[in-house]
């Protein structure tokens, strides 16, 4: 046996073990609390998955808007959705549709086009011939067999400040803009008739020109029409909002919406901030979970405030369309302007650069949010009711569980390991296991 002597580690080992041990302990604690916070909101909405639907109804569907953050790709936004938002939607067994934008302006163009399609279906005149897509084919097939949507309010989940600004811009463009695309500006490079009259060629030059035109014709046939490289240009500018009349199909209150935090910062010099956020994801999970649970339960809505009055007394059930606030009550300090505004400080510097070649080009991410009082008054936000907030607190304390169910008894660690890696079975599996009698007849029975 070798002779091992117990002694304290050296100074360098003490520093290494202290740093790595502290970081590991902070990471393990944060992930444990993050999982507990997410489980609290999942248990709050899990009773919705137990509710049965008639065979001729489809599940309530939410619309999720997400786009690539400035300076990064779409994968980061997808991971944020899957990590913080999707678990709560899955716990409630809700259907959702994701609208993604890889570049600036795609969310705005996509939302505006959806609203224009709705207005055309409502009977507003338009010269645009719509192409039949997959969604229209599925909707027609469901209508023929008598399948309808669940009669509950819908909602929009908007992830990130840049997506929120495009969402606001798309709402105004869709409801206040024209249904037909505007005429493209006339090019200034067209030669004048006088210039064409001055160039008079001799008769001998005519055959040569005809031969050259014949040679160019095959080359033109091979050319394919170029596809648009960016999102559809806006049909209306923010300066024209006030001059447009409201369409007949505009409802008294729009579908409720919920903006979701998406903190994202890049850069080597911002490493301390990134480490701090990496070790404090439990706070983000709790905040995002509260917002997502509010739109999933859809029990209470409130209008977006303008800073001139309190919104605590204006909570209304989500199934009732609240009357929009009058235009003269809405000041200039809209709540929609400042939501998630702190995220703009973390954007990459390339997002704030202006296009020198086209300085007048609209930038949805950089330009300030412009709101029309008629649209802003119809916007609603889903919030948790005081009853749901109190129930979530009881769930976190362990005094309550999923609505209508009792909290299961905790299973010891050794038993979980035996069930997972050994030959044991949990009680629920044993209950479902069929009891088979003596089918071989060994006991002469």
From Swiss-Prot:
Entry's localization field: Mitochondrion inner membrane
Biased composition (Polar residues): 197-209
Membrane topology: Single-pass membrane protein
Gene Ontology CC terms, in alphabetical order: mitochondrial inner membrane
Topology feature Mitochondrial intermembrane, residues: 30-445
UniProt keywords, alphabetically: Membrane, Mitochondrion, Mitochondrion inner membrane, Protein transport, Translocation, Transmembrane, Transmembrane helix, Transport
Biased amino acid composition, Low complexity: 242-252
Keyword set includes Transmembrane helix: yes
Residue spans of biased composition, Basic and acidic residues class: 211-226
GO biological-process terms attached to the record: protein transport
Annotated stretches, region: Disordered: 175-252
InterPro entries found in the cross-reference section: Lipid_Phosphate_FormReg (IPR050187), Mt_import_IM_translocase_Tim54 (IPR021056)
Regions of this protein lying in the Mitochondrial matrix compartment: 1-11
Transmembrane residue ranges: 12-29
UniProt record similarity statement: Belongs to the TIM54 family.
Function according to Swiss-Prot or TrEMBL: Essential component of the TIM22 complex, a complex that mediates the import and insertion of multi-pass transmembrane proteins into the mitochondrial inner membrane. The TIM22 complex forms a twin-pore translocase that uses the membrane potential as external driving force.
PANTHER family registered for this protein in UniProt: MITOCHONDRIAL IMPORT INNER MEMBRANE TRANSLOCASE SUBUNIT TIM54, SPHINGOSINE KINASE
Subunit field text: Component of the TIM22 complex, whose core is composed of TIM22 and TIM54, associated with the 70 kDa heterohexamer composed of TIM9 and TIM10 (or TIM8 and TIM13).
Protein name: Mitochondrial import inner membrane translocase subunit tim54
Organism: Aspergillus oryzae (strain ATCC 42149 / RIB 40)
Gene designation per UniProt: tim54
């Amino acid at each position: 046996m070798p002779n091992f002597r117990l002694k304290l580690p050296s100074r360098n080992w003490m520093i290494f073990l202290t740093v790595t041990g502290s970081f590991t302990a902070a990471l393990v604690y944060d992930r444990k609390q993050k999982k507990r916070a997410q489980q609290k909101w999942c248990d709050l909405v899990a009773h919705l998955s137990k509710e049965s639907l008639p065979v001729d109804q489809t599940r309530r569907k939410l619309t999720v808007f997400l786009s690539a953050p400035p300076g990064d790709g779409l994968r980061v936004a997808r991971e944020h959705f899957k990590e913080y938002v999707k678990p709560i939607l899955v716990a409630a067994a809700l259907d959702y549709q994701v609208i993604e934008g890889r570049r600036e302006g795609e969310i705005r163009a996509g939302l505006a086009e959806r609203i224009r399609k709705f207005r055309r279906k409502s009977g507003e005149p338009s010269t645009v011939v719509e192409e039949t897509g997959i969604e229209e084919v599925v909707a027609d097939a469901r209508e023929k067999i008598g399948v309808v949507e669940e009669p509950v309010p819908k909602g929009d989940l908007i992830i990130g400040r840049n997506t929120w600004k495009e969402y606001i811009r798309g709402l105004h463009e869709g409801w206040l803009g024209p249904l037909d695309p505007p005429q493209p500006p006339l090019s200034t490079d067209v030669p004048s008739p006088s210039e064409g009259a001055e160039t008079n060629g001799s008769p001998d030059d005519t055959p040569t020109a005809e031969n050259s035109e014949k040679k160019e014709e095959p080359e033109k046939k091979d050319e394919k029409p170029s596809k648009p490289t960016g999102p559809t240009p806006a049909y209306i500018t923010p300066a024209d909002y006030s001059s447009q009349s409201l369409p007949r199909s505009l409802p008294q209150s729009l579908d409720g919406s919920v903006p979701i935090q998406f903190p994202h910062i890049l850069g080597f010099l911002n490493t301390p901030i990134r480490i701090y956020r990496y070790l404090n994801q439990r706070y983000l999970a709790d905040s995002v979970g509260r917002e997502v649970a509010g739109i999933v339960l859809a029990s209470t809505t409130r209008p977006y405030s303008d800073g001139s009055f309190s919104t605590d007394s204006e909570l209304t059930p989500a199934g009732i369309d609240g009357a929009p606030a009058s235009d003269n009550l809405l000041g200039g300090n809209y709540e929609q302007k400042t939501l998630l505004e702190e995220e703009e400080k973390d954007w990459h510097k390339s997002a704030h650069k202006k296009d020198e070649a086209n300085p007048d080009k609209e930038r949805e991410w950089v330009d300030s949010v412009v709101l029309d009082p008629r649209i802003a008054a119809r916007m609603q936000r889903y919030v948790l009711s005081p009853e749901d907030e109190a129930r979530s607190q009881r769930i976190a304390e362990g005094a309550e569980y999923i609505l209508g169910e009792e909290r299961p008894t905790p299973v010891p660690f050794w038993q979980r390991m035996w069930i997972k890696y050994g030959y044991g079975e949990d009680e629920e599996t044993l209950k479902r296991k069929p009891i088979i009698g003596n089918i071989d007849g060994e006991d002469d029975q």
